[in-house]
C-alpha cells in the first residue's frame, strides 16, 4: 500500500458513493466517530441500523459523500483511503412539503485531516451535490462539546436553533 502523510501533499477527493460501498469501508471511521462524540456511551451502544440505511438509499433519500486521500491506494484504480464522510437525507420537510431539504445525519473527518480546508471542501461538495438534486435548504447540527460551527459560519450558514438532550433510560 502506498502511503502519504496527510496535509499539503495529500490529494483529497470528494464524491457521492453508493451506500454498500461506503458503509463497508467506513466501519473503522464510524467507531472512531462514535468514540469521539457520543454521550452516554456506557448506556447507549453503537448499533447501526444497516437495513434502514439501505432502505433509504434504495429509495433515493440517502446521499453519502465521501472524502478520500487519493495518495493512499491499495491498487492502481483504488479511489484512495476513506478519511471522511457526510451522510444526508433529501426529503420534503414536514412543514414545507413543496421544498426539498437536505438533512445531515452524520459527518466526520479523520483527525489527521482536520487541519486545512478538508471540512470546508467536504461541505462545499455536499452543498453542490444537494443543490443538483433540487434541495433548497440544508440543515445540520454540531455537538457543543466538539463545536465546528465556525466552518458553517465561514460557508455562510446561519445558526438557527439549539437542541437539548436528556438520558431518561434506566
What is each stretch, according to the model?
Residues 138-149:
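Conserved beta-strand-loop-alpha-helix junction that forms the acyl-donor binding cleft
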Residues 115-128:
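Conserved acetyl-CoA-binding loop-helix of GNAT-fold acetyltransferases
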Residues 141-142, 158-169:
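Conserved catalytic-core motifs of GNAT/GCN5-like acyltransferases
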Residues 44-64, 69, 86-97:
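A conserved beta-strand-loop-helix scaffold within acyl/acetyltransferase catalytic domains
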Residues 24-27, 31-53:
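Conserved GNAT-fold acetyl-CoA-binding loop/helix
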Residues 105-115:
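A short, internal acetyl-CoA/4′-phosphopantetheine-binding micro-motif in the GNAT/acyltransferase core
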Residues 10-28:
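A short beta-loop-alpha structural element at the N-terminal edge
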